Amino acid sequence: MAPDVPLRQLDLSLQFGQFPGVARHRAALPRRRVQRWISHALKTDAEITVRIVDAEEGQSLNRDYRRKDYATNVLTFDYTREPVVTADLVLCAPVVEREAREQGKTLEAHYAHLLVHATLHAQGYDHETNERDALEMEALEILLLASLRFANPY
């Protein structure tokens, strides 16, 4: 996958939960922008739902599906990979906002990174199995984000 590959067909659903400060997150995530970031990381057509949630929902999903009782930045629920990728990407707004602040990034830049990261997961990339796969995924994220004009997220 190279950054100059044409954008793939993406059926995107973008959802926001109700939580304090949701307007900031809506402003950072206009539909066209989210569509561009995700499409850029796709190797094939996709149907993807992106849901921006509060800490309570993020923690509940992480606990129920990963058995980790805390809110994490992003969860990827991938259902099919071929011929069309179908997935739900759930991002926890308070965690994303805190991490962006701690890492000295804009909210937009951190969301771009996490959406590219989650889209790669939805296509089978993994960084938790072994170091080689982790380095491959990280290098691809850096390349894709650079082509979207974002700095190295690491």
From Swiss-Prot:
EC number: 3.1.-.-
Residues binding Zn(2+), per UniProt: H117, H121, H127
Domain of life: Bacteria
UniProt-listed GO biological process terms: rRNA processing
Swiss-Prot/TrEMBL keywords: Cytoplasm, Endonuclease, Hydrolase, Metal-binding, Nuclease, Ribosome biogenesis, rRNA processing, Zinc
GO molecular function terms listed in the Swiss-Prot or TrEMBL record: metalloendopeptidase activity; RNA endonuclease activity; zinc ion binding
Subcellular location: Cytoplasm
Enzyme class of the recorded protein, top EC level: hydrolase
Annotated InterPro entries: MetalPrtase_cat_dom_sf_prd, YbeY, YbeY_CS
Principal location: cytoplasm
Signal peptide coordinates: none
Names of the cofactor(s): Zn(2+)
Cofactor note: Binds 1 zinc ion.
One cellular component (GO) term of this entry: cytoplasm
Function: Single strand-specific metallo-endoribonuclease involved in late-stage 70S ribosome quality control and in maturation of the 3' terminus of the 16S rRNA.
UniProt cross-references to PANTHER family, sorted A to Z: ENDORIBONUCLEASE YBEY, CHLOROPLASTIC
Family: Belongs to the endoribonuclease YbeY family.
NCBIfam families: rRNA maturation RNase YbeY
Protein name from the UniProt record: Endoribonuclease YbeY
Record lineage: Bacteria, Pseudomonadati, Pseudomonadota, Betaproteobacteria, Burkholderiales
Gene: ybeY
